[in-house]
UniProtKB/Swiss-Prot annotation:
Signal sequence extent: 1-37
Listed name of the protein: TM2 domain-containing protein 1
Calcium as UniProt keyword: no
TM2 domain ranges (all copies): 119-167
Bilayer topology: Multi-pass membrane protein
Family: Belongs to the TM2 family.
Function: May participate in amyloid-beta-induced apoptosis via its interaction with beta-APP42.
PANTHER family, per the entry: BETA-AMYLOID BINDING PROTEIN-RELATED (PTHR21016), TM2 DOMAIN-CONTAINING PROTEIN 1 (PTHR21016:SF1)
Taxonomic lineage: Eukaryota, Metazoa, Chordata, Craniata, Vertebrata
Pfam families per the UniProt record, alphabetical: TM2
Chain's gene name: Tm2d1
Record topological domains on the Cytoplasmic side: 151-154
GO molecular function: amyloid-beta binding; G protein-coupled receptor activity
Domain of life: Eukaryota
Subcellular location(s) of the protein: Membrane
């Protein structure tokens, strides 16, 4: 004989069908969401090595040309240095192949800025302006013969022009006439002018 269900309680088999249907729908929906999430994670595209975050790679210091004091192979104001993804990082290398790095393989080449120099030394220009500026030697050296001759004939504009030129050359405001930059020690004191125009490229932040 089957035991009687206590009075006042509904039998599980006699429970409302809506509750069972709701539980089943929730279970099925959760299963579909989990499968979709797993598929999204598994199907995530491997990033390019140049898109790695800071700290996920390390780049070598550029090799400096002793004569120009600029990175070797500087072309169009740009040079490239080798960068190595950290161990256990997987990304697409230079050839587009998905590679699991160990820390010793080159992942990508990072562009760095460099300057166009044409043989004009900053130290020489400052020295000429300080000691022979009243003769216009600094202006002759930088490729301004007319101003150099004028300073020579006026003894550096009575010294005032020599002082002004010394300040302008020391602050790297006046440079070579051909538009090139001074040869300055790569890790020395350099003046960098920053400006933003309508043509300035703003790189989109790819991660928070």
């Amino acid at each position: 004989m089957a035991a009687a269900w206590p009075a006042g309680r509904a039998s599980p088999a006699a429970g409302p069908p809506g509750l069972l249907r709701t539980l089943w729908l929730v279970t099925v929906a959760a299963g579909h969401c989990g499968a979709a999430a797993s598929g999204a994670v598994g199907g995530e595209e491997t990033p390019k090595c140049e898109d790695l975050r800071v700290g996920q790679y390390i780049c070598k210091e550029p090799k400096i040309n002793d004569a120009t004091q600029e990175p070797v192979n500087c072309t169009n104001y740009t040079a490239h240095v080798q960068c190595f993804p950290a161990p256990k990082i997987t990304c697409k290398d230079l050839s587009g192949n998905e590679t699991h790095f160990t820390g010793s393989e080159v992942g990508f080449l990072k562009p760095i800025s460099c300057r166009n120099v044409n043989g004009y030394s900053y130290k020489v220009a400052v020295a000429l302006s300080l000691f022979l500026g009243w003769l216009g030697a600094d202006r002759f050296y930088l490729g301004y013969p007319a101003l150099g001759l004028l300073k020579f004939c006026t003894v550096g504009f009575c010294g005032i022009g020599s002082l002004i030129d010394f300040i302008l050359i020391s602050m790297q405001i006046v440079g070579p006439s051909d538009g090139s930059s001074y040869i300055i020690d790569y890790y020395g004191t350099r003046l960098t002018r920053l400006s933003i125009t309508n043509e300035t490229f703003r790189k989109t932040q790819l991660y928070p």
